[in-house]
């Protein structure tokens, strides 16, 4: 099942739900740019300014964090547990 981001319903981004709320992916244009798997948020790339806005809306809606933290996680090669707030290396 695919959903639009609540904050950006007209954007060229969608969230593909793979196993309920435990496993989903953010697809910006044609590229998977972030995912939550078993509660762990992974950011795969920051790409364009528009894609960064998509990532910001996704992490706010699904991980309850802001874009700046998501960017830091990506730059530091870390993943984030959306339930506990734990940060771990990828």
What residues fall within each predicted segment?
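Terminal leader/tail segments of proteins
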Residues: 1-90
